[in-house]
Amino acid sequence: MSATLTEMVQPPNRTAPTAEPRWRNSALYFTAAWSGFFVMGVELLGGRLMAPYFGSSIFDWGALIAVFMTALALGYLIGGQLSLRSPSLRGLGLLLIAEALLALPVILFADPVFDALSFSIEDPRYGSLLAALLMFSAPTVFSGMVSPYAVRLLIDNIEKSGQSAGRLYFASTLGSAGGTIFTTF
């Protein structure tokens, strides 16, 4: 990777970024924050929804957290793979729509599903694990897909890829903190 003499002497091109990338980048950071907010909100509300049926012991919270962590990990993996195929804002929007639509069954069917599982599975540890898996894994996988996909959309300069990823995960984690506070206070 040797630079030519002209490249070494010539100052770097310092043109001002256009308005479109600034707007686009802000939208991507907001999207990451929203996704983090969404995950923590659903996770904490999930614990509250499950408590009347399975309790709120360490086993129940452990099952819920394990399902969310596993679903996020799977989403990160799939989102990274998807980002290799023609990434676009439209594609990111479709991930967000899928995330929201897959959360609808939680609102519509959580009580009957939790009720049925609490009666059919004797050990509440396994009932809560299965309940969390059935109700929360699908929307959480799609939530996990958002960040790696958004990172790919942010990166237009490989030298700043770490900075872009760091800022995106900063926004996502702040969103998670906001979702936690909003849901619990």
Where is each model-derived feature located?
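Alpha-helical transmembrane segments of multi-pass membrane proteins
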Residues: M1-F185
